[in-house]
Amino acid sequence: MDATRKPLRIPPAMALYAEEQGVFDIIQKMVKKVLVDRPKDPIQYMIDHLSNDNDDVPRVFILGPPASGKHTMAKLLCKRLNATHLTPESVLSSDVSLLAKEAQSYRDKGQEVPDELWAKLMQQRLSKVDCIKRGWILEGFPKTREQALKLQMAGICPDHLVVLDAPDIVLIERNMGKRIDTANGEVYHTTFDWPSDPTVQRNLVEPEGISEEETGLRLIEYHRNIPGILRTYPKTSKKINADQPYMDVFSQVLTFVLSKPRSLAPHTPRILLYGPPGSGRSLQASLLAQKYGIVNICCGQVLKEAVADQTKLGEVIQPYIENDQQVPDNLVLKILTEHLSSLESATHGWVLHGFPRDTDQAALLKDAGFVPNRVFSLDLSDDVVIERLSLCMTDPVSGERYHDIYKPAPSSEVHERLQQNPRHSEQRVQARLDMYHANAEELDEFYPDVIHINADQDPYTVFEFIESYTVSPLPRPLPEEPTSP
């Protein structure tokens, strides 16, 4: 590239479109489906695949030992995600095909249904419209590694495998209290979920196979088979402790099911940090820039650099800087655009802080084509902000910063010569806080995917939170809960 020419500016629209529409992932999933299903007409198959628009529907296996809560979790997930609930029994009972009749004949003879036949049955059921459009939650299957491998050979692979886990003694106690409603097959428990309706209570019966000895045998079989199943799905499985309140278990299950696997798509971080003064935005931005090589763009710093470099825009904004006045938004945006559209920012990504401070500035940034793909709000109470800033002093001799509580001066001599930045006086800090709070709620509405992080903790703990959300895809949005009629 000719270094004597004007600096290369890359318009962000192309990469932004590809990322927003998930172009890379769409193509990757289509190629995967074509290779697995091997249709006779790949072009028409891909057109149909795009028409289905079902890449993000849930495809989940829920496994676990007896009485671990598989049925409860599957029902809650299906209700929350509007997915189809499947079990081996429901697949057999609702199917009238020749395959189902063949499988039922094995059961009538007291024989095990062959794994290959199970795979064909599942493939047939999952190809129906409700599973394609809404997704599916398969409970209690596969039970062995052989069944899991047969499912893989049939092209059935879950996006998430939930494995519920609890101590055997807890599971045995749970199982012995299980009761079944003969009217509708609903499961209740003598301790944890006893119905209040006397009619339902009269319908409850003790199911077969829940004695301590029988449960122990089923647990032995489960523990023998589950390691092989986990080896079959090493990257999509997660164990969740089921020995806790069921809503806590469900919260963890739902969080996992909504998570997305790490994408192989090219990812250029465009990170926006905002928060009250003293929340640590500058420190977090510098840590991100240092570790990942992205461009650290501090609004206040680039304005001062423009003045110091005596650029044309720098000369225009110099009076505002010298008089401690707010620089007009259009001038700020012009200077930021030079940095945000640079070759380095376009190829390595950027982290921006200090702008925008309100929705008008956020709209200007969006109209200019600079849309962050991660937005973090560093939350801090006013008392902590005032404590952090108003007690911070600087040694004019060494330039070292000290804090009356967290980092006191090493000697009385140093303490006596410490000076406070005028901007850190309690009165001015409170004024900046008032300005921040006046706009914070509207900024949260402007960026609906904003991730709130508690900044009142160790800065490296805060960085770990930011890092985890930056390197991994954002979770799927949670569907709206169905409204009762």
Swiss-Prot record:
It comes from Xenopus tropicalis (Western clawed frog). Gene3D superfamilies: P-loop containing nucleotide triphosphate hydrolases (3.40.50.300). Residues 298-327 are annotated as: NMP 2. HAMAP family: Adenylate_kinase_Adk (MF_00235). ATP 2 binds at residues 278-283. GO terms for molecular function: (d)CMP kinase activity; adenylate kinase activity; ATP binding; nucleoside diphosphate kinase activity. This is Adenylate kinase 8. Pfam families: ADK (PF00406). AMP 2 binds at residues 325-327, 354-357, 361, 432. It is found in: Cytoplasm, Cytosol. Residues 269-472 are annotated as: Adenylate kinase 2.
